[in-house]
Amino acid sequence: MDFPSQSEKKKYITKKRTTLFSYDDDDDDDDFDQNREFIHMSSYEESKDQQNSFNTLLLSELSNCEDQKQQQQQQSSSPTQSDCDSSPTNNNNNNNTNNNIVHHLNNSNSIPISGSNNNNNNNNNNNNNNNNNNNNNNNSHHHHLRKGRRLFHDDNDDQPIYPASASLSSTKTNMFPSSPILYSSPSSQQQQQQQQQQSQSQQTNEFKVPSFTPLSFINNSSTNSMNIRPINNNRIYNNLNNNNNNNNNNNNNINNINNNNINNINNNYNNNNNNEEDQIFSSSLPTSPVSWSANGSMMNGHNINNITGNHSRFLSNGSYNKGNTFPSTEVKRVRPDQRAFNENSFSMSPTPSPPPTPSLKRNNYSSPKFEPVFIRLAEERTNRKRSTSMTSNVNNNNNNNANNNNVNNNNNNNNGPNSISSLIANVNPFTEEGRLQSLNKPCPSFQLVNNNNNNNNASNNNNDNNNNNNNNNNNNNNNDDTCNNNNNNSQNIDNNLITKFSLYKHTFQELDLIGEGSFGHVYKVRHRIDGCLYAIKKTKKPLKGQKDRDIVLREVYGLSAIKDHTNIVRYFNAWEEDSHIFIQMEHCNGGNIYKWVTEHIKQSESNLLLLAKQILTGIVYIHSLGLVHLDIKPENIYIIYKCNQNQIITNNNNTCSINNSSNGSDSYFKSKIKTTENDLDNFITTTNSVNNNNCNNNNNNNVDNQNNNNQNNYLIIDGNKINFNSITFKIGDLGLLNEATNTKIYSEGDSRYLSRELLHDDMSALKKSDIFSLGCTLYELARCKPLPKSGMEWDSIRNGILSFEKEDSIYDDNKNDFSTEFWQLIKSMIHPDPSVRPSAEQLLEHPLIKYGVIEIDDFENEIETLKNLLAEKEKVLIIQKEKQKLRQNQLQQKMQQPNFIELKQQPQQQQEKQQMLHQQKQQYLEQHNNNNDNNNNEFDESEKEYQIQLEQFKIQKMQFQLQQEQLQYQHQHKHQNFFTKQICTASQIEGGIKNMAL
């Protein structure tokens, strides 16, 4: 073909190639049509008559087909005037002129958007479209048709250059159901001014496009703002970008997610007549009939009707206006791998592809954390894969009043981490507290927030929604509630993003503050799932560095290494949260024993020895692991007890309530006990608040008196009489745990319980330091007075001296209550020389610790047990004596019987043997008579000798038989047939006389 000359080319305004273009596979024919002819840049009439491109012809054919289709529908349906007036869709379709020509708008870089405020303008401007087209072509820089996949571009240097893929509601996107939808680029300041001018003067002939609001300003936008969201998820984010205006005629079913069929969502859009939305269209159209048939059929009348649900509502709601058509520049459908994105758009493709040009970037959209969950649920319920197409319908509608009420009511139920405190914590029925609760009625404090009221409110709001949604089914209304419940978190997205997830608050219910120390706070908590009680340590200050973290983690390492022991506080879990370390441990319901000192609760010697025995058992286990505690003191020794009904202290002829052991509940279980002198049968449990102050005061006086004179083997805790044998003492607070062979100590313990060698940095005997600390603890409990932190008394304790003379009257009274063996035991434990101090194993073998203080009852019990042992031994001796007598009688009978063996061939040998046997028997009898005390041993020896003799006799007998056999053999050879009979007397044991054949 003939290409135009250089002079002719000046008439044509060619497209400047910049980085903002998107090219296809054949860039050489971008400036040519199907006939390889250069596209002329004249007005639209000239281009129509001379050089019409293939796509322009297709557009005109499609519009004609659509017009014919509409005329057929009007003739078949013939709606009334009232129906037409009530339907904005019919009005728009009837008033639109057959403008099937794409045109350029003057000074516009984006494609018109048909929103809620543009429907009226569409009808007014339809008559002026042709005039605008003819007048503006001369001013436009690009009036030729492009075949390649390029975006709209303006070469004007005065305005910013960007791809103008806008959201269009006026284009015929129902014919291109598979065209990906692109988002418009951010509007410049110049475009925003044009938008304001357009809103002020709507009667001008210049049709300007309102630019969309960026994503960052969506929350502050007006009713014309656009929601930039993917198509499959715009209903999920409806409440996130919810506007303030309320339309009573709007359907809440826009927010529905139908679990059974995704097509119900599209049907809801067809029923929504007043939902005027900003529709997002693609600026690219198909280039061939094959690409138009997205549903697998060729371009015909049937294919136009077979449109997807997302595009079908464009014709029904009147947003499709034939007057607002594309500009004269040809646009093509962008493939999924060539999709263009601007700065405020993001891809929903599972495998994102690179952008078509270097200047177009895909920003990482920071979606909320719950977005993938809702997306996945919606896709799983509909059994559909995530679509790679961007044909999205962004919902910019305002919810009605009923929907807003639902949001407010549901926000009270689901506030994320803020509502954790209202969750119900279970009570384990297998624990002691659970058993007590099964007997008693639940306490009012356990009746936490009930969600029935909120559910009723939700049902009432659901009824309101049914009244407002006249065009929807009841099933869709049920979906409203489910979707609203899912979107409540999106309504409070700011609070959820600010409030961090707390494992401590989510897993445990905080009940009380147990204690506070240098480490931090210790809380009594209940696990929300298993219902058990735990003690959780939390660092007081946030960890500032690795050094602080290492110091705190030493206790965690120690607890995890020790695992589980009866006399050591059990460790469960540890975690770090907000620069705080949390340690979950076993809850000890009796607290620590330091309150014995502060409250002057005196303990007997037997109780302290029982305490020392259990603590030494735990120390032995720690030392067996090659570790040392280095912080043994009353504050770190805890009590676990079990309270039974028989252990409750009561007063005669009084009726009062006493607190049972509460394993960490908010309030103790109350019980009324009516007692007599010998009766505790009438036990009535109640949960009402008790106001028996007078009875409690009288009872407390008795408790104090019993505690101050606690010489018996029991302990009074919370009004309960606890037997010391049922109490378990545990070692806790392993923050200073260290290796026994380590010469470096990170921190020292309490100076009141430190040994002298540790004060002088002597780390050679760290195990003996624990013994010194335990000795100081027993000394403090015996005195019932706190140890000094400095002074002469402090120094005397380091020297192993107990200064009895300098003590006050309280200590003098305690001195007489303990034995000298007890004080000697304490002195040995606090000896200044660590090599002299006994080890933990040796102390467990000490008689005073092993057996404790023996009382009169213990002596009587011991005597009874000894008598029983003696009686059993006497019975055994009598039986043995009777057996010995029977054996002696049998032997005498055997000796009295004659034991002669007559052998004619060897008479002399037999006589000698008989004499020897007779002599041995006589000797045996003489020895037996002389040694009556050793009858058993001598009898055994005589039996052994007798057996030896019998064996010798048997051997001789065998030899004799062999000789006889030889003689018989010789006699047979000599043919001498005679027999000799030899009669011999057998021994007394063999059973008498035997005849032998020779």
From Swiss-Prot:
Residues 140-150 have a biased composition (Basic residues). ATP binds at residues 514-522, 537. InterPro entries: CC_SR_Kinase, Kinase-like_dom_sf, Prot_kinase_dom, Protein_kinase_ATP_BS, Ser/Thr_kinase_AS. Its EC number is 2.7.11.1. Residues 23-32 have a biased composition (Acidic residues). Residues 508-849 form the Protein kinase domain. One of its GO terms (molecular function) is metal ion binding. The active site is at residue 631. Residues 1-34, 65-207, 265-284, 316-367, 380-420, 435-489 are annotated as: Disordered. Keywords: ATP-binding, Kinase, Magnesium, Metal-binding, Nucleotide-binding, Serine/threonine-protein kinase, Transferase. Residues 330-340 have a biased composition (Basic and acidic residues). Residues 70-139, 184-203, 265-274, 393-415, 450-489 have a biased composition (Low complexity). It catalyses: L-seryl-[protein] + ATP = O-phospho-L-seryl-[protein] + ADP + H(+); L-threonyl-[protein] + ATP = O-phospho-L-threonyl-[protein] + ADP + H(+). Residues 166-177, 316-328 have a biased composition (Polar residues). GO terms for cellular component: cytoplasm; nucleus. Mg(2+) binds at residues 636, 677. Belongs to the protein kinase superfamily. Ser/Thr protein kinase family. WEE1 subfamily. This is Probable protein kinase DDB_G0277539. It comes from Dictyostelium discoideum. The lineage of its organism: Eukaryota, Amoebozoa, Evosea, Eumycetozoa, Dictyostelia.
